[in-house]
């Protein structure tokens, strides 16, 4: 699949995921980062990587598709930074030592506000995980069209808490990997893709 128009590509992915019943029927995926069947397994694939095992601080988008990523980070004793939805309330830091026994609850959007604290100063980030609508094998990433993911990554670079070689991953369904994602100058690239079946590294 190779489309030059971002909106057309988003609509195509959303339509396919709904038609093939890959997206969560309780949360229509149009206009969203899709919550897909297999998101738990994709998080598990990411969890099995050396990049994950070495990471002490994980940054995650607040999307439902990445909820297991956030839960696994806390269960594995990693500090977790979550962007607040639409970045309306900044960034939230969750300490695994303070949520023991409540990792599942703390990994939700509501739970992050309950158990976490707003970040005043960023710690170094070892792994970034973003949600995506579509990705390609050159690192192109397409979000839902609001530029939140790009803004988050740019902010982390600006704060000097990530470097060019920091793993920037996404968890997606195989159907979300396309031939080419339209990329503009402001778009931030990823370098890892985890699906329910495999992990792909982009060099």
Regions found by a protein language model. Give the residues of each.
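N-terminal active-site beta-alpha-beta segment that forms phosphate/nucleotide-binding
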Residues: 2-119, 123
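Conserved phosphate- and dinucleotide-binding cores of soluble alpha/beta proteins
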Residues: 89-203
